C-alpha cells in the first residue's frame, strides 16, 4: 500500500500505500489493505486528523487509545462528488445534478481562499460554506423519501450521510482540506504504473520500489539532480 500522512497543520490522506508526508509523499509497502497496516504505520504519531477516502479499514483509527485521543477522520468531497457524477451521467438524475451544484459552491468558496492562512480560510468557510452545509444535510434526507430505497442513488445518499461528520470537519479547522486531491496528484504517476509493478519478486522488492518512488517524487518537487 502507498499512503501519505502530513505533519501537524497539514492534511493527511491515504491512497494505496503508506508513508509520512511533509511536503511530498513518502511511499511504503504493505502486504494488504487491512486495518493493521495504518494502525502499525501510525503507531506513536501524535497527529489528530487523518484525511482519507471512506475505505472501512480506516475506521479502526477512531477506536484506538492514544494520549492525543482517537484519530478524527476527514473524508473527501471529491470521492462524494464522483458518486453523484456517475448517477447524473448514467441516469440523468436531477437530484444528483442538484447535489453537484451544491458541491461546486463549496469549491467556489475554497477557490477564494486557496493558499491563504488557516484563520482566513476558516472565517470564509464558516461564513460562506457553513450555510451551504447547513441546508444540504436536511435536503439530502428529504430526497430519501422521494426515491426507491434500493436504488444506487439512495445508496449514494446514505453513504454521504453516514460519513457526514468527517465531511464537515473542514468548517472547524482552516488547516484541513475538502479532499485528498493534493496527495492523489502527487502519487498519480505511481498509480498509473501500478500494473507494471504487479510482480515485485518479493516483499523486499516491493519495499525497494516504494523507496525509489519516494525519491522520484521528492526529486520532482524539490528539483534535485539524481545521478
Give the ranges of each region predicted by the language model:
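Catalytic center-proximal scaffold of phosphoryl-transfer enzymes
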Residues: 1-227
Amino acid at each position: 500500500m502507498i499512503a501519505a500522512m502530513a505533519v501537524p497543520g497539514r492534511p493527511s490522506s491515504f491512497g494505496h500505500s503508506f508513508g509520512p508526508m511533509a511536503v511530498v509523499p513518502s511511499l511504503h509497502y504493505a502486504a494488504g489493505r487491512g486495518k493493521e497496516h495504518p494502525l502499525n504505520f501510525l503507531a506513536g504519531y501524535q497527529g489528530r486528523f487523518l484525511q482519507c477516502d471512506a475505505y472501512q479499514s480506516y475506521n479502526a483509527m477512531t477506536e484506538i487509545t492514544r494520549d492525543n485521543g482517537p484519530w478524527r477522520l476527514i473524508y473527501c468531497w471529491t470521492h462524494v462528488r464522483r458518486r453523484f457524477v456517475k448517477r447524473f451521467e448514467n441516469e440523468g438524475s436531477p437530484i444528483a445534478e442538484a447535489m453537484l451544484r451544491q458541491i461546486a459552491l463549496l469549491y467556489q468558496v475554497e477557490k477564494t481562499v486557496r493558499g491563504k492562512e488557516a484563520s482566513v480560510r476558516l472565517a470564509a468557510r464558516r461564513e460562506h460554506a457553513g450555510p451551504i452545509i447547513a441546508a444540504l444535510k436536511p435536503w439530502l434526507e428529504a430526497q430519501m423519501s422521494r426515491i426507491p430505497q434500493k436504488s444506487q442513488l439512495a445508496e449514494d445518499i446514505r453513504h454521504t450521510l453516514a460519513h457526514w461528520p468527517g465531511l464537515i470537519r473542514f468548517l472547524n479547522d482552516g488547516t484541513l482540506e475538502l479532499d485528498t486531491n493534493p496527495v492523489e496528484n502527487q502519487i498519480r504517476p505511481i498509480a498509473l504504473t501500478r500494473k507494471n509493478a504487479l510482480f515485485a519478486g518479493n516483499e523486499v522488492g516491493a519495499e525497494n520500489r516504494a523507496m525509489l518512488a519516494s525519491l522520484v517524487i521528492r526529486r520532482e518537487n524539490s528539483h534535485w539532480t539524481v545521478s
